[in-house]
């Protein structure tokens, strides 16, 4: 992981992908990196924060504090601006913006189109552009490439180079998943691929596989669709186990004793930027650019099953309260954890919002708690656990933050109005909770 080539690198989009990628690249000799970030009301604070050498992630991110201080303050190799004019001096431009889907499951490329156009205005001959945002298969060549060519007056493959290389980052392991995971790189032509591989070799320790741009796009969306389908199986089996009166985690242990089996963990729902929408990106790609239509029934059903899990958690809450003679309408419910992933501050597509919405729709008063999340737009959120739990009729665990494993059940029972605990992430041992005097319900535990 060394660089003998001097590169001016621009990374557009300072989020969970762009920031660690930019910082790692800036840590390599010969690299100078500029991040581009909008000064929006939601994310504009990151500009000054990063330029002060601070890690903007509130979750546990090993190595990030030290890396940010080193590349910003010591090496002065990384800073952030909102001015796209920095693209005119770039040798490499990475695009790391969100690519959500709308309520009709159609990709919304407003940000991708905008940044492609703005970067394209400053594009010079010889520049390498890499799309790291997850996109529907066919997007790089059918949407991004024409925009770059139109705005720059240059031709991809002849005047500038274009590739797609998807991220595999996960909050809590942002740096590790970039440096120590295999990388897939696909360019629109051989030279684009070669240059992109050369770039990533400066920061990736594992194997880098070169392929076509379309194959790389398909690999990313299929990889996440595969995981989503496996999680859906586990979630459905969890409900089967509830019906049969057994513990799904015991069944999982028995199944996974066979070396070629890997039943995933069930839970309160699937979140994050990728899994809830990448199956739809895959389907959109084949629907739009494929030679013929493919129903893609399995991935659609998996999405439906996983989307039902937050509502199932609410049903378990209703059942547990009823056992105590409490109705949900008018009850106070503490929702514990709003990040989609444990010990992170990432709330993108978090199942917690679906849980809260369903509870409130049924008349509950909800206070959410999370030790890492700053705010959750439109929802009452506190970092004070006692505020959430004081006088609560039920505590519902949505995220398995380490903090919740250490909850003092006796103290919890003392401050809650009704000792009801609903576990969406297998945080507690059922027997221990019930022995402490709680009514307990959990996903997958009959």
Predicted regions span which residues?
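Structural/interface elements that position substrates and couple domains in central-metabolism enzymes
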Residues: 1-446
């Amino acid at each position: 992981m060394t660089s003998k080539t001097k590169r001016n690198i621009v990374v557009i989009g300072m989020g969970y992908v762009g920031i660690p990628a930019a910082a790692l690249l800036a840590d390599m000799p010969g690299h100078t990196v500029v991040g581009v970030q909008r000064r929006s009301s939601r994310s504009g604070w990151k500009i000054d924060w990063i330029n002060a050498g601070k890690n903007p992630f509130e979750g546990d991110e090993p190595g990030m504090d030290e890396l940010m201080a080193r590349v910003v303050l010591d090496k002065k190799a990384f800073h952030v601006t909102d001015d796209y004019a920095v693209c005119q001096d770039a040798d490499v431009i990475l695009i790391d913006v969100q690519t959500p889907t709308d309520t009709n499951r159609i990709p919304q490329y407003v940000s991708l189109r905008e940044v492609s156009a703005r970067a394209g205005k400053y594009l010079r001959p010889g520049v390498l552009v890499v799309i790291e945002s997850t996109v529907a298969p066919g997007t790089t060549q059918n949407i991004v490439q024409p925009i770059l060519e139109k705005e720059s007056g240059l031709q991809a493959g002849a005047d500038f180079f274009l590739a797609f290389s998807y991220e595999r980052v996960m909050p809590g392991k942002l740096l590790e998943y970039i440096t120590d995971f295999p990388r897939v790189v696909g360019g629109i032509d051989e030279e684009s691929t070669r240059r992109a591989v050369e770039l990533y070799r400066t920061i990736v320790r594992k194997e880098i596989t070169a392929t076509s741009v379309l194959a790389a796009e398909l690999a990313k969306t299929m990889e996440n669709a595969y995981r989503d389908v496996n999680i859906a199986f586990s979630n459905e089996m969890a409900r089967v186990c509830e019906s049969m009166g057994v513990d799904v985690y015991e069944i999982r242990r028995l199944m996974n004793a066979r070396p070629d089996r890997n039943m995933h963990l069930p839970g309160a729902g699937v979140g994050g930027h990728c899994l809830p929408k990448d199956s739809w990106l895959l389907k959109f790609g084949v629907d739009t650019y494929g030679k013929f239509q493919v129903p893609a029934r399995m991935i659609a059903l998996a999405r439906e099953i996983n989307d039902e899990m937050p509502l199932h958690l609410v049903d378990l809450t209703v059942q547990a309260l009823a056992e105590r003679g409490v109705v949900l309408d008018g009850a106070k419910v503490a929702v514990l954890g709003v990040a989609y992933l444990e010990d992170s501050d990432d709330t993108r597509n978090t199942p917690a919002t679906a849980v809260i919405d369903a509870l409130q729709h049924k008349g509950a008063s909800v206070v959410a708690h999370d030790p890492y999340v700053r705010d959750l737009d439109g929802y009452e959120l506190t970092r004070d656990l006692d505020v959430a739990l004081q006088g609560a009729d039920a505590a519902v665990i949505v995220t398995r933050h380490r903090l919740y494993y250490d909850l003092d059940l006796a103290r919890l029972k003392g401050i809650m109005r009704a000792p009801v605990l609903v576990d969406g992430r297998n945080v507690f041992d059922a027997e221990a909770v019930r022995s402490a005097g709680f009514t307990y319900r959990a996903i997958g535990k009959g």
